[in-house]
Amino acid sequence: MGEPRAGAALDDGSGWTGSEEGSEEGTGGSEGAGGDGGPDAEGVWSPDIEQSFQEALAIYPPCGRRKIILSDEGKMYGRNELIARYIKLRTGKTRTRKQVSSHIQVLARRKSREIQSKLKDQVSKDKAFQTMATMSSAQLISAPSLQAKLGPTGPQASELFQFWSGGSGPPWNVPDVKPFSQTPFTLSLTPPSTDLPGYEPPQALSPLPPPTPSPPAWQARGLGTARLQLVEFSAFVEPPDAVDSYQRHLFVHISQHCPSPGAPPLESVDVRQIYDKFPEKKGGLRELYDRGPPHAFFLVKFWADLNWGPSGEEAGAGGSISSGGFYGVSSQYESLEHMTLTCSSKVCSFGKQVVEKVETERAQLEDGRFVYRLLRSPMCEYLVNFLHKLRQLPERYMMNSVLENFTILQVVTNRDTQELLLCTAYVFEVSTSERGAQHHIYRLVRD
């Protein structure tokens, strides 16, 4: 257990220390427009603007008519407004949301023509046309969205989606095929059998050096580094009469037990965009990133599944822990190094720390690697009450408005050397999928 941080008020008995400075909750925001000023070279999309536009498309997935509240401004933004805002921040040049919308439509029409020209047979063309007719322009220019809609339609499917990924990144799920064997070999020449005067037989050629070992397949495609990898993370509730973990309800969940070597590399997000969502004081995200190492910083966007158990009214007074059930968090890490890990989890509201929990875990050697398990760590009462109050809100957009100002910062260090091994920033929305909790992992960078 770590020492209580500045402003700590009490320890609730589960290892969480609290602070009053960040306990405010609420929603906010009025309708806002992104970039309505006079455009810079209106209608011209220079390379820097196009680059920022493509980056914004990756950061902000299609969200229909739903809007997002940015805590630093308290305004609600649609996707096109966020893209226009991103372009302004990155390039200093203004593009209105209407210009962004027009540009998306132009690209969608172009992509539609190109995709149909790539398909060889009429059946595939007809199916693609029918599917694309049901999609918005925003979905049409998103390769993953289109692939999910169309699915593999024939022998041309692989080529099709490599083409659709365009120049914004590497093709999706393309294996790294080497043109030559990587196996080292030895080439030697047998000297001729001759007694010619002055003849010196040639020396055997030295073997070629072995190839440099490749980094693990997950390293650029999952949450982890060469020194420490996250294997699993979950926040859950178990009913009082649960007999095994299958009866859990998972609010959020990450599983990296079997990382796919064919998965695309992680997308990047500028860490400066989320500085204000975390404490500015000692131990905040800005200071941690300044110290580095930069490759150990990640952002996880969770779409949390809040569809569980009884309603808030049935859960008991304030939805507290005494209302029944066990609320917990489990995580597992792996490493090739023998260490003792310290894991700090800070819950933040409006960019200020509310509570913090510090845990320590020793290594267990399993199958030639060191495993670190922090299992069934009790969730603090603040979080349990927060979940129940959040669930009582009548509309999903209200829940998302509250979650816009709610974040968690998790820092894993080597206890003995104080080296930072992993730093993960978590942000949240409410899941709309019947498949439950979902997530997306990004790498935090600073250009």
From Swiss-Prot:
- Which residue spans does the record list as DNA-binding? 38-114
Q: Does the keyword Transcription apply?
A: yes
Region of interest called Transcriptional activation, as start-end residue ranges on this chain: 172-447
Return the GO cellular component terms, semicolon-separated: chromatin; cytosol; intracellular membrane-bounded organelle; nucleoplasm; nucleus; TEAD-YAP complex; transcription regulator complex
Q: Where is this region: Disordered?
A: 1-46, 183-218
Among Gene3D superfamilies, the record links this protein to:
2.70.50.80, TEA/ATTS domain (6.10.20.40)
Q: Which UniProt keywords apply?
A: Activator, DNA-binding, Nucleus, Transcription, Transcription regulation
Superkingdom: Eukaryota
Provide ranges: composition bias, Gly residues.
25-40
PROSITE patterns registered for this protein in UniProt:
TEA_1 (PS00554), TEA_2 (PS51088)
GO molecular function per UniProt: disordered domain specific binding; DNA-binding transcription factor activity; DNA-binding transcription factor activity, RNA polymerase II-specific; RNA polymerase II cis-regulatory region sequence-specific DNA binding; sequence-specific double-stranded DNA binding; transcription coactivator binding
Where composition is biased (Pro residues), the residues are: 207-216
**Bias (Low complexity):** 11-20, 183-206
- Role description: Transcription factor which plays a key role in the Hippo signaling pathway, a pathway involved in organ size control and tumor suppression by restricting proliferation and promoting apoptosis. The core of this pathway is composed of a kinase cascade wherein MST1/MST2, in complex with its regulatory protein SAV1, phosphorylates and activates LATS1/2 in complex with its regulatory protein MOB1, which in turn phosphorylates and inactivates YAP1 oncoprotein and WWTR1/TAZ.
Q: How does it assemble?
A: Interacts with YAP1 and WWTR1/TAZ.
Name it. Transcriptional enhancer factor TEF-4
Instruction: Please report the organism this UniProt entry assigns to the protein.
Output: Homo sapiens
Q: Which gene specifies this protein's sequence?
A: TEAD2
